[in-house]
Amino acid sequence: MYQDLIRNELNEAAETLANFLQDEANIHAIQRAAVLLADSFKAGGKVLSCGNGGSHCDAMHFAEELTGRYRENRPGYPAIAISDVSHLSCVSNDFGYEYVFSRYVESVGRAGDVLLGISTSGNSGNVIKAIEAARAQGMKVITLTGKDGGKMAGSADVEIRVPHFGYADRIQEIHIKVIHILIMLIEKEMAKG
């Protein structure tokens, strides 16, 4: 009944991944991001992650597998997803939703820390404000974006962009693969000492 639709969806997902893989710059960006994060951890820094909707879930997934575990048992790494409901609702109510991430970055972000901002469009205003706050704090910035990078293009120390212009779910599928690879590489870097 839906076999052709299922095949089409999986083929489109495979094609999106193949297109991402063809650009060697993406491979280098993932490596640079992992080393940047590991260097921050080694120096006593932490990572703050943020995004909206599915990207928010990805930000939480990233932090959870750093503080908990990925594939192997190892010490936890300092990672915080900006996801505290009381903070999000307070700032949304008192200041506006565009400040929910930046207020948190201003409160706990420090020089030497890293912000991971995730937006499939690259146009999420609250993530952009978080990037601005991170810069003001002396933090490094990594972004996971899609399409043409949107307004976030060029705002990060390392941008990992999925140049897919269809639905956001295809971009998110690559983002979660990148997140898992980042964690694997961070573990390898941290094991070096």
UniProtKB/Swiss-Prot annotation:
NCBIfam families, per the entry: gmhA (TIGR00441), PRK00414.1 (NF001628)
Xref: Pfam families: SIS_2 (PF13580)
PANTHER family noted in UniProt: PHOSPHOHEPTOSE ISOMERASE, SEDOHEPTULOSE 7-PHOSPHATE ISOMERASE / DNAA INITIATOR-ASSOCIATING FACTOR FOR REPLICATION INITIATION
Enzyme class: isomerase
Cited HAMAP family: GmhA
Biological process per Gene Ontology, one example term: D-glycero-D-manno-heptose 7-phosphate biosynthetic process
Main localization category: cytoplasm
GO molecular function: carbohydrate derivative binding; D-sedoheptulose 7-phosphate isomerase activity; zinc ion binding
Family: Belongs to the SIS family. GmhA subfamily.
Known function: Catalyzes the isomerization of sedoheptulose 7-phosphate in D-glycero-D-manno-heptose 7-phosphate.
Gene3D superfamilies with a match to the protein in the record: Glucose-6-phosphate isomerase like protein, domain 1
Cysteine pairs bridged by disulfides in the record: none
PROSITE patterns, alphabetized: SIS (PS51464)
EC id: 5.3.1.28
Other remarks on this protein: The reaction produces a racemic mixture of D-glycero-alpha-D-manno-heptose 7-phosphate and D-glycero-beta-D-manno-heptose 7-phosphate.
Residue stretches making up the SIS domain: 37-193
GO CC annotations, alphabetized: cytoplasm
Cofactor annotation remark: Binds 1 zinc ion per subunit.
Full protein name: Phosphoheptose isomerase
Gene name in the database record: gmhA
Keyword line: Carbohydrate metabolism, Cytoplasm, Isomerase, Metal-binding, Zinc
SUPFAM superfamilies, A to Z: SIS domain
Record's subunit section: Homotetramer.
